[in-house]
Amino acid sequence: MSDMTAAAAAPGHTPIARLLHWTVAVLVLLMIPLGFVIANEWGGPAQQFLYNLHKSIGATLLLLVVIRLVYRLTHPAPPLPSDIPAVQRFAALATHWALYVLLLIQPLVGYIMTSAYPAPVPFFGLFNLPAIWPEDRALSERLSVVHLYIGISIAVIAAMHISAALYHHFVRKDRVLMRMVSG
């Protein structure tokens, strides 16, 4: 089988893996600018609405990332093309797992930070999530800095991930991107 035939026959991700990937991706791409907007908005109903939206999406992401991690651990990703150099394989693995870890930690830090403030964690106006930390304003302030830096890290690593996917599609012309798009 030629390399081109092998690339064309390479298996794609399952429909569930693709759904989880793209749902998390869209929410993360919404959260990055949303986080920066609310950090630079000064009071008023718009800021409160955006904070509540941010918290609701964060809670949703926490649940989806846990589901995604469990699914990934029980349904491994298809192998990368065999001609990808070892350093790129390592970079892909490190980038994926860094994103998983940060996307799991970030909403937890936000949840603890908000609980320690203390402020409610509304879920799309339906109900408030329970506080998970006692009031501690000093901790909340420190965690807000941690939350910021994790958010920046997620944005940088997501940009690397997107760049790598586009590199595979437009430069290498392999199926790495398409197997997450269409299987």
Name every feature range the model reports, one short phrase each.
Residues 1-183:
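Membrane-embedded alpha-helical bundles that constitute the cytochrome b-like, heme-associated redox core
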